[in-house]
Amino acid sequence: MPAPRTEPRLPAIIALLAVGGIYTALPPFLTLGPRWLLLAVVGALLIPTVVSLRTGHYQLNRVLGYVVSAVITLALVVSLVLLIKALPTRAEAAPELLRSAGALWLANILVFALWYWRLDGGGPLQRDRRGAHTEGAFLFPQMTKYSKTATEDNWSPRFIDYLFIAFNMSTAFSPSDTPVLSRWAKVLTMLQSAISLIIVALLASRAIGIL
């Protein structure tokens, strides 16, 4: 029996394509191979991912989802390593370096927002099956008894909620009003904050002539 699909997947698809699009704007020294390669790979993986969801092959859909998230994560890590290795010896203009900093910083937010969305509560499919979101890796305000109303009894997080967490982790280095409960989520949030700090510190400081 097909599982109900109440959570829209379009925001996550747009985020995945946005990560690929961001990489087309990076300078060559921050990518491996052609800059359009990541976008092409993501697009190619999204086709069977969407098809498997619509045809009810949910296990395959979940595996493909992990694969595409792993691909963009690997691309982010590779770019960060290339940045650390190459930045001290390069002489790019400050505007280009600032654009690169902004691009990688934004990619970092999207990559980890996708991981939070994909892993919390068993993923979007499991959240759909349960209906009301009463437990997970993050304690959203709507899950507490003090904020529940009659209209929030069946509340469940959407991609924008995880994007909000990821944005706060990269700007304020904290999840703001959403405590992190699970160990895996704590590890991911620490990793995201560390990557954001490295990107901002290295690229921004180089751009203004500190390095």
Task: Name the predicted role of every residue range.
Residues 156-211:
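Pore domain of cation channels
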Residues 23-36, 54-58:
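Short, hydrophobic transmembrane alpha-helix segments
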Residues 11, 32-45:
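Structural signature of hydrophobic alpha-helical transmembrane segments
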Residues 1-15:
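N-terminal membrane topogenic signal
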Residues 16-30, 50, 82:
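Membrane-embedded alpha-helical segments in integral membrane proteins
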Residues 121-178:
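Membrane-proximal soluble regions of multi-pass membrane proteins
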Residues 87-125:
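Pore-domain transmembrane helices of cation channels
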Residues 60-72:
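Cytoplasmic-side transmembrane-helix entry/capping segments in multi-pass membrane proteins
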